[in-house]
Amino acid sequence: NATGFTRMVGVAYRYFAEHGGGHIACITSIAGTKGLGPAPAYSATKALQNTYLQALEQLSLTKHHNIRFTDIRPGFVDTPLLSGTAHFPMLMTTNHVAKCIIKAIRQRRHVCVIDTRWRILTFLWRHIPDWIWRHIRLA
């Protein structure tokens, strides 16, 4: 999730920088919002992805590379990866998420948390003090 992502996005960035610009859209996750105890490595790599895209966007603007970025952060999506596992709250269909992704790219959004329910939840997560967050049981 970390090495492959940074290498792949780095290649795309350099290509667009050399060819007059472009649009890099990446699907990361809401898991990068805060450290999640049930999935520490996953949430850490997703936070890395969010920060890496933010840093590259800043670099692109300062160097006038004309590269746009869209960081797509879905919540739980009903895919084979999640089937047969524990109950996941606010599960979204792949159709719904795909439509939201297309809309975010067309609107050239910088960050798109899919969907409104997850946007509200992650907003709240960001405002929970760390001394409280440490004691919240997520699993």
What feature does the model see in each segment?
Residues 9, 45:
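Active-site helix of classical SDR
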Residues 34, 55-68:
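Active-site-adjacent segment of SDR/Rossmann-fold oxidoreductases
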Residues 34-40:
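Active-site loop immediately N-terminal to the catalytic Tyr-X3-Lys motif
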Residues 71, 86-122:
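C-terminal helical subdomain
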Residues 74-84:
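Short, flexible catalytic-loop segment of classical short-chain dehydrogenase/reductase
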